[in-house]
From Swiss-Prot:
Topology versus the membrane: Multi-pass membrane protein
Main location, first listed in the record: membrane
Name of the encoding gene: cobS
EC number annotated for this UniProt entry: 2.7.8.26
Family according to the record: Belongs to the CobS family.
Organism from which the protein derives: Thermococcus kodakarensis (strain ATCC BAA-918 / JCM 12380 / KOD1)
Superkingdom, natural source: Archaea
Pathway membership: Cofactor biosynthesis; adenosylcobalamin biosynthesis; adenosylcobalamin from cob(II)yrinate a,c-diamide: step 7/7
Class of the enzyme per the UniProt entry, highest EC level: transferase
GO MF terms, alphabetically ordered: adenosylcobinamide-GDP ribazoletransferase activity; cobalamin 5'-phosphate synthase activity
InterPro entries: CobS
UniProt protein name: Adenosylcobinamide-GDP ribazoletransferase
Amino acid sequence: MRNILPFLTRIPVKGDFEKARNELWAFPLVALVSSALPTLILYLGLPLSNLLAVLALYWTIGLLHLDGLADWADGIMAKGDRERKIEVMKDVNTGIAGLFAVVIVLLLQVYSLQLLPFYALFLAELNSKYAMLLALATKRPLGKGLGAYFMEGMNGRQLALGTLLYVLLGLSVVLFEPRALAGILGLLFGVHIIRISLKNFDGLNGDCLGATAEITRAGTLVVMALVWWYL
């Protein structure tokens, strides 16, 4: 797992670029690391803990995926054919669609956490990382960036092992709180983003992976917040 950490977090560990794509199965395990500090903040019940937890999350994982979400949203909302949408997505300038998407995702996370137990963010991060693994499993690269490099290393064995880890980590919470099972519905957000990306861009790049991660996490928290509110 050490080799994949530098690509998914800001934790200062040395990873081997060549070996990283052979550790894609460890994506779900990364959720344990990326959610550790935010979960501790929520567990301690500090003032404004929901806001502090989200800040701690992005301090841990960085803003790369959030930036990808902004670029992805600009591309999706652009009018024109596939080439035009890809051109807009790759533009370094952020448009109103990208800004709107980032603000909404951040607000959904902050406000949903107010209604949820301390371990909710871990489940949301688990879904987020697994959704990225599913995106890589499509093996439909757009361009020749990091996403394409990881897709080359993706295979059935890595997906199967990653899925097993996802299930085991999820069960560790579900057995304690059955309502947490509803969190699996958050994966549908990720699957939908993957489908939209393939339809509009005919492939997936790093921006699409970032959007998948961010929207899956926010969607999972919203679903769980609704379940906790009504049940």
